[in-house]
Amino acid sequence: MPIIQVNMLEGRTTEQKRSLAKGLTDAAVQALGVNAQSVRILIHELEPEHFAIAGVTAGEKPLANGNGGAR
């Protein structure tokens, strides 16, 4: 039973998270040859103040890649 954990900044829509879960499930089925019913996806949403690069939190300076989680 594959368990896939995703950590990402909060702010994405329910539809985006559902799409991500579906895509990851499909990828696991194809790559690992498992049944889709056995795939578990855990999405952990992080507050911007709980994610930092080089000591600067995403709340202080939004990430430059347009991550969708910046406020």
Where are these regions (language model features)?
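A domain-level signal for the structural core that forms small-molecule/cofactor-binding pockets
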Residues: P2-R71
